[in-house]
Amino acid sequence: MVDLLIPGPEGKIEAKYSHSNRDDSPIVVLLHPDPSKGGTMHTKIVFKMYKIFIKAGFSTIRFNFRGVGKSEGFFDDGEGELSDAACVLDWLQQYNTNSKICWVAGFSFGAWIAMQLLMLSLIHI
């Protein structure tokens, strides 16, 4: 596991990343619950998902939305958090160019952002 500070739209985004041993492994971005209600990348279910995806052979990243932990910026009611997620997904895809499978998963608020990210990705295809 590697600690990262990824450049984001409102400053640095704190992340934890585990790279698979396989060059063509699937990738996954994990999104945490509502920051305004105490959600972080360390939330129990997000941490467990992180471990499960690593065990399944995925290159896996979880991160804190803006204003949480070491991530810079302020909570933006979902709009800015979607930008954060898109930025982290872009970083992950650029770092794993041989991956053909990409997942995005979240819990509660994180699932809502994940669905928006999927819709945004479909628009840009």
Locate predicted features.
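A domain-start/cap signature at the N-terminus of enzymes
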Residues: 1-4
